[in-house]
Curated annotation (Swiss-Prot):
Family: Belongs to the radical SAM superfamily. RlmN family.
Note in the entry: Reaction proceeds by a ping-pong mechanism involving intermediate methylation of a conserved cysteine residue.
Top-level taxon of origin: Bacteria
Gene3D superfamilies hit by this protein: 1.10.150.530, Aldolase class I
Name the UniProt record assigns to this protein: Dual-specificity RNA methyltransferase RlmN
Gene designation: rlmN
Residues that bind [4Fe-4S] cluster: 114, 118, 121
Annotated organism of origin: Shewanella denitrificans (strain OS217 / ATCC BAA-1090 / DSM 15013)
Biological function: Specifically methylates position 2 of adenine 2503 in 23S rRNA and position 2 of adenine 37 in tRNAs. m2A2503 modification seems to play a crucial role in the proofreading step occurring at the peptidyl transferase center and thus would serve to optimize ribosomal fidelity.
Length: 373
């Protein structure tokens, strides 16, 4: 039985240099190879003209360059494109391309499904299947860049920003997420600034500490509630790592990071009469007063069977004004791609429609109190 070939997309530069050394080659060949793969989108060794023919043959015998395929895509009226990426065994993850002015952001998945079961998130209701490999994470970027068009003569790439905000909790897949982000940041990889790579987490605190010791990228934190009582319902991982513990981890990360310029982005989904009262805005401001941050208010994007509604513009505006009175920078996120279910919280692969009856049942089970202001 022939030995399984190494997928070079699974190796960061350190891993590639080790491979070349083991093959009896100079480590700098790894740099050349990465440039072909990530700058020019080349997957055929024969096209790598500055690598000698003997080495190209050795690579072809032992290695492959294989990214997961695009199974389908949908394009929104606003230019957003949602890709279904086939990761094998009948499984798909979703990747979203968001163009805006002079930037083009790719929202990348880290897991098939998600184990955290956030009650406002469609992916969280799908359940967890498995972690994605390094090649399946960076392969999303590589494949979408190929779809959009690498400019092979210049090495220009069509993606300027990557956010680890797709399906899954990145901190539950650190083994593969860290080398994948290394490739994103590497000058011979996707060559993105550390301020242009953002990881979003719901608060797996021990893994956040490991992340801070391993790599420096921008951090977004999913808060979504101003107190533990409500967050236990909306973000169940809070029962294990409550807000005080999460905020401590965030401050430790900020202290180590240059990418965040001294503050993180707080993500707060706006759920109608659930977490959007002016009293809760005051509570959130007091909660975050010792954690340098800007606040990103995210209008809720409904999905079939969701027990929640989107906050009205007037409630979002009042909430925002309270936070600004405390000196916070507040951004209300534009909803992009909601006509193709590509907006925040809507990514769920094969998740099926839930009925209104199920939504009502979930609301009753969680005993969520509704604010009346």
């Amino acid at each position: 039985m022939s030995e399984k070939k190494i997928n070079l997309l699974d190796l960061d530069r350190k891993g590639l240099r080790a491979l070349f050394t083991e093959m009896g080659e100079k480590p700098f060949r790894a740099d050349q190879l990465m440039k072909w793969i990530y700058h020019f989108g080349v997957s055929d060794f024969e096209e790598m003209t500055n690598i000698n023919k003997v080495l190209r043959s050795k690579l072809a015998e032992r290695c492959v360059i294989v990214a997961p395929e695009i199974a389908s895509f949908q394009k929104s009226a606003d230019g957003t494109i949602k890709f279904a990426i086939n990761v094998g065994q009948g499984q798909e993850v979703e990747t979203v391309y968001i163009p805006e002015d002079d930037r083009a952001t790719l929202c990348v998945s880290s897991q098939v499904g998600c184990a955290l079961e956030c009650t406002f998130c469609s992916t969280g209701q799908q359940g967890f299947n498995r972690n994605l490999t390094v090649s399946e994470i960076v392969g999303q970027i590589w494949r979408v860049a190929q779809f959009l068009g690498f400019v092979k003569t210049t090495g220009e790439r069509p993606i300027t920003n990557v956010v680890m905000m797709g399906m899954g909790e990145p901190l539950l897949n650190l083994k593969n997420v860290i080398p994948a982000m290394d490739i994103m940041l590497d000058d011979f990889g996707f060559s993105l600034s550390k301020r242009r790579v953002t990881l979003s987490t719901s608060g797996v605190v021990p893994a956040l500490d490991i992340l801070g010791d391993s790599i420096d990228v921008a951090l977004a934190v999913s808060i979504h509630a101003p107190n533990d009582e409500l967050r236990d319902i909306l973000v169940p991982v809070n029962k294990k790592y409550p807000l005080a513990e999460f905020l401590g981890g965030i401050r430790r990360y900020i202290a180590k990071s240059n990418a965040n310029r001294g503050r993180v982005t707080v993500e707060y989904v706006m759920l109608d009469h659930i977490n959007d009262s002016t009293e809760q805005a005051h509570e959130l401001a007091k909660l975050m007063k010792d954690t340098p941050c800007k606040v990103n208010l995210i209008p809720f994007n409904p999905y079939p069977g969701s027990p929640y509604g989107r906050s009205s513009n007037s409630r979002i505006d009042r909430f925002s004004k309270v936070l600004m009175e405390y000196g916070f920078t507040v951004i209300v996120r534009k909803t992009r791609g909601d006509d193709i279910d590509a907006a925040c919280g809507q990514l769920a692969g094969d998740i099926r429609d839930r009925t209104k009856r199920l939504a009502k049942k979930r609301m009753q089970e969680n005993q969520i109190s509704v604010t009346m202001d």
